[in-house]
């Protein structure tokens, strides 16, 4: 199967869950950055044998809004931009990543 690396996907769709899940929290910004960097080398798993082919992986993103607010929209994402913006936000707010809520989001790449 021709798996597509995340950074080369022509279209990336993020399906945001309406229910937020607690996940293991990195205890510093370097670990958070490393999680996002690893996604760039990660391969998508084919969801079905269909055309256009759809591949799926998982993404952990730091939540910056109040807990309980639903985030159920779809939009394209750029991992490099996400990583830099997330780190800038975290550094700017001087967040303590302990006990922070991360979102578990399904990431789908569609190869046209």
From Swiss-Prot:
<comment type="subunit">
    <text>Component of the CENP-A recruiting complex composed of at least mis16, mis19, mis19 and mis20.</text>
</comment>
<dbReference type="GO" id="GO:0098654">
    <property type="term" value="C:CENP-A recruiting complex"/>
</dbReference>
<dbReference type="GO" id="GO:0005654">
    <property type="term" value="C:nucleoplasm"/>
</dbReference>
<comment type="function">
    <text>Component of the CENP-A recruiting complex that ensures the integrity of mitotic spindles through maintenance of kinetochore factors mis6/CENP-I and cnp1/CENP-A. Links mis16 and mis18 to recruit CENP-A through interacting with non-sense-mediated mRNA decay (NMD) factors and the SWI/SNF complex. Also links mis18 with the CCAN/mis6/ctf19 complex to promote CENP-A assembly.</text>
</comment>
<keyword id="KW-0132">Cell division</keyword>
<dbReference type="GO" id="GO:0000776">
    <property type="term" value="C:kinetochore"/>
</dbReference>
<keyword id="KW-0995">Kinetochore</keyword>
<keyword id="KW-0131">Cell cycle</keyword>
<dbReference type="GO" id="GO:0071459">
    <property type="term" value="P:protein localization to chromosome, centromeric region"/>
</dbReference>
<dbReference type="GO" id="GO:0051315">
    <property type="term" value="P:attachment of mitotic spindle microtubules to kinetochore"/>
</dbReference>
<dbReference type="GO" id="GO:0034506">
    <property type="term" value="C:chromosome, centromeric core domain"/>
</dbReference>
<keyword id="KW-0137">Centromere</keyword>
<dbReference type="GO" id="GO:0051301">
    <property type="term" value="P:cell division"/>
</dbReference>
<keyword id="KW-0158">Chromosome</keyword>
<protein>
    <recommendedName>
        <fullName>CENP-A recruiting complex protein mis19</fullName>
    </recommendedName>
</protein>
<keyword id="KW-0498">Mitosis</keyword>
<dbReference type="GO" id="GO:0000070">
    <property type="term" value="P:mitotic sister chromatid segregation"/>
</dbReference>
């Amino acid at each position: 199967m021709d798996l597509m690396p995340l950074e080369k996907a022509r279209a990336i769709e993020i399906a945001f869950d309406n229910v937020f899940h607690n996940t293991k929290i990195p205890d510093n910004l370097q670990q958070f950055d490393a999680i996002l960097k690893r996604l760039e080398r990660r391969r998508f798993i084919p969801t079905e044998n269909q055309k256009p082919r759809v591949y799926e992986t998982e993404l952990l993103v730091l939540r910056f809004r109040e807990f309980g607010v639903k985030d159920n929209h779809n939009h394209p994402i750029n991992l490099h931009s996400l990583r830099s913006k997330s780190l800038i936000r975290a550094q700017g707010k001087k967040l303590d990543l302990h006990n922070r809520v991360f979102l578990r989001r399904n990431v789908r790449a569609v190869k046209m």
